[in-house]
A protein has these predicted regions:
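Catalytic core of pol beta-like nucleotidyltransferases
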Residues: 1-19, 27-29, 33, 46-134
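Short hydrophobic/aromatic beta-strand micro-patches
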Residues: 40-44
Length: 134
């Protein structure tokens, strides 16, 4: 069974998971035998303690299932830059709640767009200061 199918069958129909994305080397075809598996999971829960417990629970189980080192990221608390990479280069393998995923994406894209503006402003300011010799 391929790693994509294995991940999909493992996480499908899990009530506490909204969506699962594969990202990193396995998503862009650069994986090697020693590569780890990077998964981003959307739980749709704002309680960091509960999300961390679920990450721990699923990390052990999916690592055993895949027989690979696996890294899990909670999309619920991921930064804008990481979310941008997950949405841009990741592969969505599981959607258990399409409405919650659509809402999360709408909110995340809004934050990513705002963050991009402020990051650009900050970078322009830094470059200007360097050019001025400060």
């Amino acid at each position: 069974m391929s790693i994509h199918k294995n991940i999909k069958s493992f996480f499908e129909n899990k009530k506490d998971i909204v969506a699962v994305y594969l990202f990193g080397s396995y998503a862009d075809g650069r994986e090697r035998a020693s590569s780890d598996v990077d998964l981003a999971i959307l739980f749709g829960n704002r309680d960091r303690g509960i999300v961390n417990q679920m990450l721990d629970k699923y990390l052990v189980a999916i690592s055993r299932n895949l027989r690979k080192d696996t890294h899990l990221t909670a999309m619920d608390f991921a930064g804008e830059e990481l979310l941008k990479q997950i949405f841009k280069k990741g592969i969505c393998l599981v959607v258990n709640d399409s409405k919650k995923l659509a809402y999360f994406k709408m909110m995340a894209f809004s934050k990513i767009a705002s963050f991009h503006y402020y990051r650009s402003q900050m970078q322009s300011g830094v470059v200007r200061k360097v050019m001025e010799g400060r």
